[in-house]
């Protein structure tokens, strides 16, 4: 199976790579901004290739990225969109550049990546967007997460729209709205907070869903949380 993991250099994404790479029949391409971390992954796993990518600037490297996918994979059976950016700040204190960076990373860049890869995805392939309970309708909302939550809500809604558009291609797309997970990003944003789930546990769940969830769901926004969030 040919798998692209968008945002796989740390946290949940890194653990998803580790889990998926255990099956040597999987051919994986991992994207991320941290080239040192990417090199470490490709050195550790023989079935992992990497591509240095800032998803917020995807359009500037689109042609090179598509060429890399064509050379290394040919087709894409699974796409996991994990790349994300979080700034914790009161809405009134945000600058336009900070707000745009969140939206470019969490929504526009991911949407551009999907648009570029769909022509390479066969019938029966599966796209999984990783959203957040912060963007899940009627979930608890938290101070300082206005733009982050809005970007994740946009990604969830896009998932529903694309499920309808991609029916003619036989491509399945779903969205997992994650609750709090103990990761570097959570530690940086909320020092001292202890989440009920760690990155390894969540990665195992996500990996299983990526492989088999397309048999049971399409266009669904599924909360993956013990509490709210």
Place the predicted regions along the sequence by residue.
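Substrate-binding pocket helix/loop in short-chain dehydrogenase/reductase
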Residues: 90-91, 98-100
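Rossmann-fold cofactor-recognition segment
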Residues: 45-59
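Conserved NAD(P)H cofactor-binding loop of Rossmann-fold oxidoreductase domains
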Residues: 82-88
